[in-house]
A protein has these predicted regions:
Chain A
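ABC ATPase NBD Q-loop/coupling interface
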Residues: 14, 63-82
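Catalytic Walker B motif of ABC-type/P-loop ATPase nucleotide-binding domains
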Residues: 167-170
Length: 290, 265
């Protein structure tokens, strides 16, 4: 499902002394099936953009097209349930939304709100708990008895259980240990490919953006300043610096290596694996030419 | 919706009202609440309303914003207004449509009570809007000082107050966040039939309580760690400063009381 933001502007608490402009003239196209990373410095408007993707916030200027549905500034939008079912959001610290007596009921809450029959919802819950690497016993426990990492996974399962077409992730791994981060990010990537989801990842982590995304958008001071492929965005260090961002670790290491060894690697390394391969290739080439 | 609520909010500014000493403002509000009950006629209520609007004007807070922020209060206001209209049976009969009979006295009472309510809500809102929670607490602590003699835990009361005031906006923001998260999961408190809306309260309240308790615990720990031991022997960093405007404001209030007394029927 395509999402298209056209000249979107948004002010919080409009018409009060607390009015605060968050977005100005943001145009962004999220093509169906893409994995888009939205990166930017703190306070750049990333999270505000994200909430427009399923009409939790309505633009105060411009319009947002979500699939066939158009949400326009100044026009009352009714019956947004369909939109919200199709676009699932995993918020920052999603464990805060847990409330039900048992994990099972909590995961079933979303799908049942959207009219999925009980057996089907329960089936999805069982399946997701397994996919997320949780032991099946947790289903009968209270979500408040789980550890922080487990709560996070349950909350994510609660969103995935709605089987959205578009999955929007707001720093889904903030505060998790490195291994948990990797597992969850890999899971999202697997789902993205298996189910042909459209994924939007809002993140501070350039490494995650470089590793998983096929498109990157940079937000700066409420504007969407650049969009493009990760290779071109992350190889342009100067531009990243302008927006107070750093290239991912792998590229920083690649640059250091290039400077020290005096060789230029063939391609930009977005992941550790790619970096290792690029270095190996360069070294092989160097040996062959000797 | 949440961001328009103004209970317990503080809007920084530098109007005369903002600059007043919190002790003066708090005493002013309490005396004013008492004075309001002197009024009993159209003229006196008119004076009260005029005076209140003057205070709003001096505080440089936009009337529109104030009215918008107090919308929930108006529902209560309208409710009491109609209660008076329908249930007071004195004076001349003004209107009679079958089961509804409206009497002159009912209408009068309805209007008076509404004005009284409005004036009280405005003045108390102006107090919290123009005074930071910290100054309010400082003021209350000093004003209640004499009661320490009878073992009233004044400092603790003031602290409790400032903590609750401090956390109103935080809890509001949190409510908004959880509301959105649940909306994204298809539970919408803002639309749909009444039954659905009531059902949607549980997924909102439980997470809110959980996080409020967690916050309280964190706060207690943070205070403990910094060696908080209550008010005994505690010195103040912020000193209160009573100036001419403060005395003047109380004089004006006395004048207002006199005027109301004079015009009272």
């Amino acid at each position: 499902m395509d999402i298209l933001l056209q000249e979107v502007g948004y002010s919080y608490a409009k018409d009060t002394p607390f009015e605060k402009r968050a977005l100005t003239d943001v145009s962004l196209h999220i093509p169906s099936g893409s994995y888009t990373a939205i990166i930017g410095h703190t306070g750049s408007g990333k999270s505000t953009v994200l909430q427009h993707l399923n009409a939790l916030l309505k633009p105060t200027e411009g319009s947002v097209m979500i699939g066939e549905r158009k949400i326009e500034a100044g026009v009352k939008a009714k019956n947004l349930r369909d939109v919200r079912r199709q676009v699932g959001i995993v918020f920052q610290f999603p464990e805060q939304q847990l409330f039900d007596e048992t994990v099972l009921k909590d995961i079933m809450f979303g799908p049942m709100n959207y009219g999925v029959p009980e057996e089907e919802a329960s089936r999805r819950a069982h399946e997701l708990v397994e996919q997320l690497g949780l032991p099946p016993e947790v289903l009968t426990k209270s979500p408040f008895d789980l550890s922080g990492g487990q709560m996070r996974r349950v909350a994510i399962a609660g969103v995935l259980a709605m089987e959205p077409d578009v999955l929007v992730l707001d720093e889904p791994t903030a505060g998790l240990d490195p291994r948990g981060r990797r597992e969850i990010m890999d899971l999202f990537h697997r789902l993205h490919i298996q189910k042909g989801l459209t994924t939007v990842l809002v993140t501070h982590s350039m490494e995650d953006a470089a590793r998983y995304a096929d498109r990157v958008a940079i937000m700066h001071n409420g504007h969407c300043v650049v969009t493009g492929e990760p290779e071109e965005i992350f190889s342009n260090e100067e531009q990243l610096g302008d927006y107070r961002l750093e290239p991912p670790r792998t590229i920083r290491l690649q640059r250091k290596f290039e400077a020290k060894a005096g060789i230029k690697l063939g391609a930009i390394s977005l992941t550790e694996e790619a970096l290792a391969k690029n270095i190996a290739l360069a070294l092989l080439e160097g040996r062959d030419s000797e | 919706m949440m961001e328009k609520m103004i209970f317990g909010r503080f809007i920084p500014g530098n109007s005369i009202i903002h600059q007043m000493d919190p002790r003066a403002k708090i005493s002013f509000v309490f005396v004013f609440i008492a004075i309001v009950f002197i009024a009993n006629s159209a003229v006196t209520y008119g004076i009260l309303l005029g005076f209140t609007l003057l205070v709003v004007f001096l505080s440089k807070i936009r009337l529109y914003f104030l009215i918008n922020g107090l919308k929930p209060v108006f529902i209560l206001l309208i409710f009491t207004f109609f209660l008076h209209i329908f249930f007071t049976r004195e004076g001349d009969l003004l209107l009679d449509i079958g089961f509804i009979e409206i009497y002159e006295e009912g209408l009068r009472q309805g209007i008076f009570i509404s004005v009284r309510f409005l004036v009280l809500v405005f003045i108390t809102s102006i107090l919290t809007l123009t005074t930071s929670p910290i100054s309010i607490t400082d003021g209350i602590e000093v004003l209640l000082g004499p009661f320490k003699r009878v073992k009233l835990p004044v400092h603790e009361l003031a602290l409790m107050m400032s903590i609750s005031l401090r956390f109103i906006p935080t809890l509001m923001d949190e409510t908004g966040k959880i509301l959105k998260a649940q909306m994204a999961r298809g539970s919408d408190i803002g639309s749909g039939p009444m039954k659905e809306r009531i059902k949607a309260v549980v997924p909102l309240l439980i997470p809110l309580f959980v996080s409020a308790f967690k916050r309280a615990e964190d706060l207690a720990t943070a205070m403990e760690v910094r060696g908080y031991r209550g008010g005994e022997g505690r010195t103040r960093y912020r000193q209160l400063d009573w100036r001419f405007v403060d005395s003047l404001s109380l004089l004006v209030l006395a004048g207002l009381a006199g005027m109301l007394w004079y015009f009272r029927v």
